[in-house]
A protein has these predicted regions:
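Juxtacatalytic substrate-recognition/specificity segment
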Residues: 22-163, 169, 221
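Beta/coil-rich, acidic/histidine-enriched accessory regions frequently appended to metallopeptidases
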Residues: 25-28, 53, 225-229, 253-378, ...
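Acidic/His/Gly-enriched intrinsically disordered linker/tail segments
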Residues: 91, 113-117, 131-245, 249, ...
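Multi-bladed beta-propeller domains
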Residues: 295-316, 346-368, 383, 393-414, ...
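Outer-membrane beta-barrel initiation region
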Residues: 301, 334, 341, 528, ...
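Beta-strand C-termini and the immediately following turn/loop, strongest in propeller blades
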Residues: 311, 324-325, 331-338, 369-375, ...
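Feature captures outer-membrane beta-barrel proteins of Gram-negative bacteria and organelles
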Residues: 538, 656-664, 685-712, 727-745, ...
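C-terminal outer-membrane beta-barrel translocator/porin domains of Gram-negative envelope proteins
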Residues: 717-718, 725, 737, 766-938, ...
Length: 1014
């Protein structure tokens, strides 16, 4: 009866949620189900279906892949730049952002974006989903591919058995996809990337570290200014080396999953290549150093350009910069390790750098889009660069900042000194639109929107600049074949939406980047990988000629006109881009360098056959089998089922059973049902069977948008109760519903609310060992949280900012007419952190909390007093845990005192926490299992309050407690993918209760805990 009612309730909720997501649309063929968020995006369907079909057929033939399910694609416009993501767990799905790509430094190819996305993302799907005989057995046994669940860690083992190739490092997945994308697009890919060549050429030139496999994951992706991009760089480079050395066919054999293949990616590598992956990686590093030394010799055939550093270190990622003659400083956005992203001012003579304004939501590589008004001293810049960009302005003299337009979605800003207008390129709904803003920059006007699709020769634009007299607009156009053209357009024509003009120079397949006018308007300076190395080029407006003004060993970018005879440019280094001064004079010549990609192309002709033909025009009416509103429940069904082991109320009472997982395509709707049985005679007969069910809905459009969760259970068991000391399972039945959403994205503020009904409980739901005097009660809560904390590159925790929350909770106990009562509690928390200027990554946090219980007047003998109290004590971590590493930061733990041993109706708590810099392990372990980092935190807190339910002769009982503690955390990585954390803590506490008038020393507490799936 209980299970039937629970299932009926959850299904009814599911059908309700179906209608709430009705604004989503879907178009389905036999192979793909495309879900899109706006009817404005429907124009992309023919191109997407065509490129998907073309790429999918190629992958299936090359890898011998036979799909057992169709693929779901979510097509959305949640960010300003195009991007993609794919996963094969538990179902095959792809998520694509339809915006134009970010072409900065040619880190992305300029080929048609849907074609490129399908080449790349389908490689992920095919190489991770492809099963052999053993995988198919486990998928059949568990009724699907198993996703890991933090609630039941045994799912880790089941997930690996059903999809072993999913469990490989990111460099393996991204390197494979980049390798395939490059050949499928007929050499237009990052295997031929000049940026990639520059990165490793610079490492060899500077004799810098080229990480091994473990070091890349433990240090390279976290402390380097390029962070996660290193997975693409290293993965592409190593896989290209392996293919070049052993043959591209060996690569296909390695990433495929035939019946005789090994499950783990390193074991399969040894089987295919006959050498361990560690040895092959070492061989690649030796080869790389030799290859790049030869390239350096080619560059040095001609005199290299001398330079004078402007700063004493690399600045990580940098934006476009401006030199202000009034202050003698350059202004630009910077984003580098151990510092928060910011608008910075760098003194050209001294190199001293100071912060002008913080940048929230900085981007890797370009940081922010900027434009400068030298007369007013106003610098315009964008924030939230990973989503919908906002336009801000800061005065570089007063450092006063102001938000101009929220969600403008524009970048490539340029300031017209002639009429004070601001120009930019806005990305929306897959289109690029040139826009213009007039003072006070509160609204914009669309000048020209570039079309998208095969019928348009030019479909994207970037890199805008305006001549000093305002008569000429410079812009780069991109065509469907990935060719960039630097154009000069008379402003009189541009204002009318006519962007036909003069092509300045044919840079062949290399993109002209960051071209800016000199202050006198006679020249334009920019960079290009024309020779394979990024150098600075000068265009003479009068002579109509282009000459190279640098010959650099690494790469020069983002020129800033300084004087007639000098330029400031950004030189690539291992620490990022460093501003340097170079002479403004033509160089003798520059030499081309070699690319590994072309070596593969010439040495292994088979890759030339991997170039896909142009996607065919397709008649959607003939292949579409369904079109209309997207109904998540139409694809809702069983995703997997597997055995579980849990415990009920005591680690000594294990319970055995099964968990069933349900899911719709894309995971918008999820559900699970766990049924376990406790065979122990010590458990009452009516408590031996345990039920727990959950339904989760993510509604992304409409008035009900947000996250909804519905949970119900009876005598529910819990895996982590097998270990203690915190026990989560309770006797009794319950039904809860909760809802959360972000109500203000700018501040930001998140709202959460919930309702619950409980019956048969002997203990409070949230506090073990605290008796619920009456076993039937109702609860409700409403909370608001604010999170504005930031971390610097290379950190492992939030380092500065503020975190706040305010919550209201009420429990209604309908005991009887005389004692039924509402127990309401108010809780507020505020934390503030700052970086100490002693060493890098040394934050100090002040964490405060206060609570007040509205207990009323008659409370001295209330039998339900526990509902109105706050309880404190202990670290709270179990031996094996999942609820957070730093539990002591919450208001209710109190390391050094027993769990829930302290009770209060009103309290104030203050904690100080010092987080020491992390210790990173460059190579401790193997790709299968390794250590990532270790850190230590020191904390101390004071708790003072009163307990209105406990009286002394002088009134309510006053309590005072203090503690001091330390916690060490060690990050562990399993399967090259799964992160866990081993924590060791020690706390000492003392308490003062006024009825004893003495301080009481608690027994010191030691905590050891392994956090699963952190």
């Amino acid at each position: 009866m209980i299970m039937r009612n629970l299932l009926v309730t959850l299904l009814c909720i599911g059908f309700w949620a179906t209608s709430a997501n009705g604004q989503l649309k879907t178009t389905e063929t036999e192979d793909v189900d495309i879900i899109y968020t706006s009817p404005l995006h429907k124009y992309l369907l023919p191109q997407l279906v065509s490129t998907f079909t073309n790429s999918y057929n190629f992958h299936r033939n090359l890898f011998g892949y036979t799909p057992t399910e169709n693929i779901s694609i979510l097509m959305q416009d949640f960010g300003d730049f195009g991007h993609g993501g794919a996963d094969a767990l538990p179902t095959n799905n792809i998520n694509i952002g339809i915006g134009p790509f970010n072409y900065v430094y040619e880190t992305m190819p300029a080929s048609e974006r849907m074609n490129w996305l399908m080449h790349h993302e389908l490689t992920h799907i095919v190489t991770t989903d492809m099963p052999n005989k053993r995988d198919r057995f486990w998928r059949g046994l568990f009724r699907g591919k198993v996703s890991t669940s933090i609630d039941d860690p045994l799912s880790i083992m089941y997930s690996y058995l059903t999809n072993p190739r999913r469990y490989a490092p990111r460099w393996y997945h991204e390197g494979s996809a980049v390798f395939m994308e490059s050949w499928m697009a007929n050499t237009k890919g990052r295997v031929f990337g000049a940026y990639d060549e520059m990165v490793f050429r610079t490492k060899v030139r500077d004799n810098a570290i080229i990480y091994d496999i473990v070091g890349l994951e433990s240090e390279g992706k976290t402390t380097d200014f390029q962070i996660g991009v290193n997975s693409y760089l290293y993965g592409t480079r190593f896989i290209s080396y392996a293919a070049n050395t052993y043959g591209p066919e060996k690569f296909i054999e390695w990433v495929s999953r035939p019946d005789d293949s090994k499950a783990y990616f390193t074991s399969q590598f040894k089987k295919v290549f006959g050498v361990s992956i560690d040895q092959a990686w070492d061989n690649w590093i030796v080869w790389e150093r030799d290859f790049q030394n030869k390239n350096l010799e080619l560059i040095r055939q001609y005199p290299t350009t001398p330079f004078r550093p402007v700063s004493n270190k690399g600045l990580g990622s940098v934006s476009k910069g401006f030199f202000d003659e009034k202050t003698g400083k350059i202004y630009l956005g910077v984003f580098y390790p151990a510092e928060v992203s910011q608008i910075a001012a760098v003194d050209v003579q001294t190199g001293k750098m100071e912060k002008v304004a913080d940048i929230h939501g900085a981007a890797i590589f370009f940081v922010t889009s900027v434009a400068f008004d030298p007369e007013g001293g106003n610098l315009y810049y964008t924030m939230d660069n990973g989503h919908w960009r906002d336009l801000w302005v800061v005065n570089v003299n007063t450092k006063k900042v102001q938000l101009l337009i929220k969600d403008l979605r524009s970048g490539h800003l340029a300031f017209n000194r002639a009429d004070k207008s601001l120009w930019g390129i806005r990305n929306s709904d897959g289109y690029s639109t040139v826009i213009r803003l007039e003072p006070p920059y509160e609204n914009y006007k669309s000048i020209k929107t570039f079309g998208y699709g095969g019928q348009f020769d030019e479909y994207d634009v970037h890199t805008v600049d305006i001549s000093p007299d305002g008569s000429l607009l410079s812009i780069v156009k991109v065509d469907m074949n990935g060719i960039h053209r630097l154009m000069h357009i008379p402003m009189s024509k541009a204002l009318k939406g006519d962007f036909s003009g003069k092509q300045i120079f044919d840079f062949d397949s290399s993109a002209p980047e960051n071209f800016v006018f000199s202050t006198d308007g006679k020249y334009q300076f920019g960079s290009s990988y024309y020779s394979g190395v990024s150098n600075i080029f000068r265009y003479d407006m009068a002579l109509d000629t282009v000459v190279a003004v640098s010959n650099c060993e690494t790469g020069f970018f983002r020129p800033i006109p300084y004087s007639e005879d000098s330029l400031i440019v950004m030189r690539y280094t291992g620490e990022g881009f460093m501003p340097v001064m170079i002479p403004n004079q033509e160089v003798e010549d520059v030499s081309a360098v070699d690319f590994m990609g072309w070596d593969i192309y010439d040495k292994h002709p088979i890759v030339q056959k991997w170039a896909t033909k142009a996607p065919p025009d397709m008649d959607l009416d003939k292949i579409v089998i369904h079109e209309g509103d997207y109904n998540p429940m139409s694809t809702f069904g069983l995703a997997s089922i597997y055995p579980v082991v849990q415990a009920y109320r005591d680690p000594k009472w294990p319970a055995y059973g099964a968990r069933m997982n349900f899911m719709s395509k894309l995971g918008l709707n999820k559900g699970d049902l766990t049924i376990t049985y406790s065979p122990q005679d010590t458990i009452a007969q009516d408590q031996k069977i345990h039920f727990l069910g959950n339904m989760k809905f993510n509604i992304i459009t409409g008035p009900l948008a947000g996250s909804w969760t519905f949970s119900g259970g009876k005598d529910a068991s819990d895996f982590y109760d097998l270990f203690g000391p915190t026990i989560s399972s309770r006797k009794g039945s319950f039904f809860r519903t909760s809802f959360s959403k972000t109500v203000d994205k700018e501040l930001p503020i998140k709202m959460s609310t919930g309702l619950g009904v409980y019956g048969g409980f002997e203990e409070l739901p949230d506090f073990q060992d605290r008796v619920a005097a009456y076993d039937k009660f109702f609860s409700g809560n409403l909370s608001f949280s604010h999170y504005k904390a930031r971390r610097t590159l290379g950190s492992i925790d939030q380092e500065k900012g503020r975190i706040a929350s305010l919550s209201f909770s009420s429990t209604y106990v309908p005991h009887d007419t005389s004692t039924k009562k509402m127990y309401t509690k108010i809780n507020g928390n505020f934390s503030y952190g700052l970086l100490l200027p002693i060493v890098d990554h040394l934050p100090f946090w002040i964490r405060t909390s206060a609570g007040y219980s509205l207990v009323g007047d008659d409370h001295s003998t209330d039998p339900n007093s526990s509902f109105g109290e706050f309880y404190f004590g202990g670290f709270g971590n179990n031996w094996i845990d999942h609820q957070g590493i730093k539990r002591y930061r919450e208001y209710y733990p109190f390391p050094g005192a027993g769990i829930t041993s302290i009770g209060a109706t009103n309290y104030v708590r203050i904690m100080g926490e010092l987080i020491l810099p992390p210790l990173r392990f460059r190579h401790v372990g193997t790709p299968f299992f390794y250590l990532n980092w270790a850190r230590m935190s020191l904390f101390s807190s004071v708790l003072q309050g009163s307990d209105m339910y406990s009286y002394t002769d002088d009134g309510e009982k006053m309590i005072r407690f203090k503690n001091i503690g330390v916690q060490i955390d060690i990050r562990l990585v399993l399967f090259s993918y799964m992160q866990s954390t081993l924590s060791i803590g020690y706390g000492i506490a003392r308490g003062y209760i006024d009825e004893t008038s003495n301080w009481h020393d608690f027994k010191p507490e030691t905590m050891i805990s392994l956090q699963i799936l952190d």
